[in-house]
Amino acid sequence: MSPRVRLIVAVTLFGCLSSPIWSRQISFEHILGANKEPENWLTYSATTFSQRHSLLSQITAANVKNLELQWIYQARSLEKFEATSLVVDGVLYAVQPPNDVIALDAATGRIFWTYSYHPEHARPCCGRVNRGLAILGDTLFMGTLDSQLIAIDAKDGHPIWQTTVAKARSAYVITHAPLIIKDKVLVGVAGGEFGIRGFIGAYDSRTGRQVWRFNTVPGPGEPGHETWGGDSWQTGGAPVWVTGSYDPALNLTYWGTGNPSPDWNSDARPGDNLYSDSVIALDADTGKLKWYYQFTPHDDFDFDSVQVPVLADIEWQGKPLKVMLWANRNGFFYVLDRTTGQFLLGKPFVKVTWASGFDERGKPVRVAGQTPSLDGTLVYPGNPGGTSWYSPSYSPRTGLFYIPAWVNSSSMFVKLPGPYHEGRDYSGGTARSFVPFNWSPAPNFRKEEEGYGAVLALDPQTGERKWEFKMADVTEAGILTTASDLLFSGGREGYFFALDARNGELLWKVALGAAVQSGPLTYSVKGRQYVAVNAGNCLFTFALRQ
């Protein structure tokens, strides 16, 4: 951001210094104990276990029909509004595209302050989006589309420090919400369609100094380097663009990684291409790899495994076990031992044709002929996958895992050889889907035989589908469950709805006039529970009729 823009922002913000919106410091212990204060939403996925399950219960199956719109915030951008807001003691912190932070009264929508940042040389693949913030003490943290990490005073919006994470001209971008662990701010870099070399970095929350870095594409001398042919590791991708999770008992942080580069011309990168399309478990203090599991070795399909790692403590074969639940873009649902990374279960939750199952080590068994070709190859699931970055939820009350899914959707995968050029597209082909993306100008000509969107409820013990809520269109909305056994979600068709989490019964819905492309959140102010969600370029907030 230029000095002139900095001056304009500073003058604007100093005029708002008198806004009395702050009462206490948010310590890391507060974040770890987020379930003890469900009136707030302190991290991207509600807790470091990323279950997106709230203990609030004022809104129930009996009264959810009485939800009424309380206020709307309209963003000053027409880009996709994908961020999950934070809520701290009655103040809601939102990010509007591309990188503007807004502090609002969570009960009324009144704006306290706005911090505007204009990313320079940003080259995102898929929209100028941001998915949220992190908070520690009285400081907010935001990653930007030009790969900056910025610390912002939560009281008045004044920038505190700014550090460069990666080179924006090479198409490194940050789109996800940072994750706070102890006194560190963790972020990863996106840019897998441009041949970046992915990594996750930890930064000192006070200064912005890098503390450690883990390369998701290992270089010479690093374990896993042998899974890359020639010099392909230098442009290997494996981006990180969705927020990870953390288990304090194990001191492990878990992150999903994206596709290897180029996406569809895998001839350019022989080998399994570690650690692309994997979950990696890192020591939170040092960044050292403890274990990994690769969902799609030598990915041909752009099946990013950046889904949120959902942590749960369940009974497994009669014994208590720390597990990780994962619905992958590749169409399979997984259960892993999160202490060791051991593969416990893999089962398709949508139609899958690229793999027939798993070997004894948990590695997928590829189906012959199911690879991109010059003429195009039809594969299920399609390029959008069975699911993607939109957040699932796990309810300890029902014991079910809930997925926003693209059911029975396919693509024609085409590979096109081509050279790498810094900062330019390096996809190596294309994927033709029968369902237009929601940012496409093409009309939506979806037919039922081409797939549909749904909320799926899975039994983690078996991977079996317990119920399905079918939508008229596909979905890019996350899921929220609550202690009153409600499930909130939405879809591209423009509805926001509440289901009975036990059986999928529709209890309430409202038309918002635009696609829901974020995860709902819930919070309370002065004893009143609210539910908020983004649709189009607006933030809608609901509460029970008074």
Q: Which role does the model predict for each range below?
A:
Residues 50-168, 482:
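N-terminal cofactor/phosphate-binding cores enriched in small/glycine residues
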Residues 198-209, 272-287, 340-341, 453-460:
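Beta-propeller blade signature
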Residues 73-84, 114-134, 162-177, 194, ...:
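Extracytoplasmic beta-rich repeat domains
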Residues 26-69, 216-223, 363-368, 444-445, ...:
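Blade/loop signatures of beta-propeller domains
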Residues 518-546:
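Blade-level signature of beta-propeller repeat domains, shared across WD40, Kelch, NHL, RCC1
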Residues 105-108, 153-156, 205-207, 284-286, ...:
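Short loop/turn segments that connect beta-strands within beta-propeller blades
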Residues 38-39, 89-90, 137-138, 182-184, ...:
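Short coil/turn segments that connect the beta-strands within blades of beta-propeller domains
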